[in-house]
Amino acid sequence: METVSLSLWNAPRAEAPVVATVALPGSKSITNRALILAALADGPSTLTGALRSRDTDLMIEALRTLGISIETVGADTTLRVTPGPLQGGAVDCGLAGTVMRFLPPVAALASGTVHFDGDEQARTRPLDTILDALRGLGADIDGASLPFTVRGAGSLRGGRVTIDASGSSQFVSGLLLSAAAFDEGVTVHHDGKTVPSMPHIDMTVEMLRESGVEVTTPATGGEADTWRVSPGVVRAVDRAIEPDLSNATAFLAAAAVTGGEVTVPLWPSRTTQPGDAIREILLAMGADVRLDGANLTVRGPQQLTGIDIDLHDVGELTPTVAALAALADGPSHLRGIAHLRGHETDRLAALAHEINSLGGNVTETEDGLTIVPAGLHGGTWRSYADHRMATAGAIVGLRVDGIRIEDVGTTAKTLPGFENLWATMLSAAAGTERKASF
């Protein structure tokens, strides 16, 4: 069997407090939702500030395969999306959960057969929840995970379906995003443990409403754990995409762990992005956090304190928080994140193993991690083809000599050029502000 060798990136250590302004590209979660809605809309839409990364480019190519025209206008972050008749084809999902969970409902509306596949690692990710739901709504689908086939009939009946979305909020969002195009719309009822990452469902609902779609939720007087999308027209909407706040967390963490100061411009005052929770997390760990107009600035303390926190709704921040906790001066307890075992990798096991391999003291619990301060040393940090694992290693590397990150290029999934952006942040002398831009 041939052995694949992955390159190692020497994570730079901060020799002084980081002082920088870091401009981040658009949100992956918003970009891919906006692309789906634009593809199903009643006319052309323009998306400004869209993220161009592996995940979003996979979504763009998948929609083009299905018959949607997507063109760049000037900068490659401005996209003109023109709907067209949906057709069959072959879709590469890569490792993008949004592609493998948001596209099958669109494929069910196509006139033709759509074959889905992705990276080898993606074939282990659970998809039976959304595929079984689509079958219950009238779709013809072979398979329960990648690879699978959707035989589109040009329309989908829709109706009511009960699912267990405790593994991922994307199962709910995936059904809701296309539901206005179903003959009967859709009613999605969740039966199971609490749905994780609820802000992502809130994001989906808000964007649907901005597109003129009628949505009933538990928060607006609907049935508990139930979301209803009425059939109707998806209005074409031009959108300006917010910066990706989850990607910003690693750069803000750089200020926190070095006692420095990092500013991220264009931070929204109101947002459904889970990444916004980093403000309260860093504050609780001793950092100074200020939102001044559209600029968010974090100033790091002399020493971070530990934290006891339920991350259930913002689980994607766990790698950043775990890295912070590994460098804090007291124990931390990260709870409510058992669902992370089904992400790009088992993030709980991966974080525990990588921190412990550097001399750390991390224990897996039933639904999270307990992290006790310990002297860390250099070593190889595996990324597991997981972009957030790679950035977590970079955070640790700011304070620990000799951290070598395996396959840092996996960050291109949501933030291509991460290494250059990270290096630019660290490039000038302490006390001299520098600006890193995507």
From Swiss-Prot:
Keyword Transferase: yes
InterPro entries with a match to the protein in the record: Enolpyruvate_Tfrase_dom (IPR001986), Enolpyruvate_Tfrase_sf (IPR036968), EPSP_synthase (IPR006264), EPSP_synthase_CS (IPR023193), RNA3'P_cycl/enolpyr_Trfase_a/b (IPR013792)
Enzyme class: transferase
SUPFAM superfamilies on file: EPT/RTPC-like
Entry annotated with the keyword Transferase: yes
NCBIfam families recorded: aroA
Functional description taken from the UniProt entry: Catalyzes the transfer of the enolpyruvyl moiety of phosphoenolpyruvate (PEP) to the 5-hydroxyl of shikimate-3-phosphate (S3P) to produce enolpyruvyl shikimate-3-phosphate and inorganic phosphate.
Quaternary structure and partners: Monomer.
Protein name in the entry: 3-phosphoshikimate 1-carboxyvinyltransferase
Gene: aroA
